[in-house]
Curated annotation (Swiss-Prot):
HAMAP family: PebA (MF_00792). InterPro entries: DiHydbiliverdin_OxRdtase, Ferredoxin-dep_bilin_Rdtase. GO terms for biological process: phytochromobilin biosynthetic process. It comes from Synechococcus sp. (strain WH7803). Belongs to the HY2 family. Gene3D superfamilies: 3.40.1500.20. Disulfide bonds: none annotated. It comes from the Bacteria. Residues 16-35 are annotated as: Disordered. This is 15,16-dihydrobiliverdin:ferredoxin oxidoreductase. The gene is pebA. Pfam families: Fe_bilin_red. Its EC number is 1.3.7.2.
Length: 241
């Protein structure tokens, strides 16, 4: 279901000079003898980003998942990029979340970084789901303009591909604008490097405590592996708490 999305994401990473980085041993791939599903993960070093992770779960008609989070360098205070796509084939159900995940909810910060996502929010009204994601506080690490959809095959085949491409383009444009400002000798950030580091670490801690996918991974790949995956790969800063 999500192979074309994965290819598009990796293509953009390669075009931006991304290089593979080491995934913690034993976490790059896992096969479930119980469900027959498999999970593969990639870690990328991309100019302007300190960490970019990608995960693809393939459990056939039962479940398909694509997840990715990009963490900008600490010298850049712009939002993290968050992608969560889930397809439950037996029920023909799509859950999609695409967001620029803000480090803070300050109005000036939102005005500086979210014009591109605001435009997508207007362009794709079918992905403007107002339903709150139950595991998270929408006012923390999620933007008011996230693209969110609970739909079916029509949304998965028609709305989502165009929205995904436009979303990646908008995020790259925001990132490029920040790099251009930095190259001109002016700081693109209003938050200090220490503040960005602290807030990105807090994001990991917050997300690890609430990640709804942890139970899903546990059901497929067991508790021990899934606990390691949560704290060592998905949200590594949560290990220090």
């Amino acid at each position: 279901m999500f192979d074309s999305f994965l290819n598009k994401l990796h293509q953009g990473i390669h075009q931006r000079g991304g290089q593979p980085a080491a995934v913690p041993e034993g976490l790059e791939h896992c096969h479930s003898s119980k469900s027959g599903g498999s999970i593969d993960s990639w870690l990328w070093s991309v100019p302007g980003f300190r960490r970019w992770r990608v995960t693809r779960l393939d459990a056939g008609e039962s479940l398909q998942v694509l997840n990715s989070v990009a963490y900008p360098d600490h010298s850049l205070d712009h939002p993290l990029m968050g992608v969560d796509l889930l397809w439950f084939g037996a029920r023909q159900k799509l859950v999609a979340v695409l967001d620029f995940q803000p480090l803070i909810q300050d109005q000036d910060y939102l005005d500086r970084h979210f014009q591109g996502l605001k435009a997508l929010h207007e362009r794709f009204p079918e992905l403007n789901g107002e339903e709150t994601m139950r595991s998270f506080d929408p006012n923390q690490y999620f933007s008011p303009w996230l693209l969110f959809c609970r739909g079916g095959a029509q949304e998965a085949e028609e709305s989502l591909p165009a929205a995904f491409d436009a979303f990646l383009t908008a995020y790259w444009a925001m990132h490029d604008q920040a790099l251009d400002v930095e190259a001109a000798g002016t700081s693109a950030s209003t938050l200090s490097i220490n503040d960005v580091e602290r807030l990105q670490e807090a994001y990991d801690v917050y997300s690890a405590e609430r990640d709804p996918a942890h139970g899903l991974f546990t059901s497929h790949f067991g508790k021990d592996w899934s606990d390691r995956f949560l704290h060592e790969f998905l949200f590594p800063a949560s290990q220090s708490t």
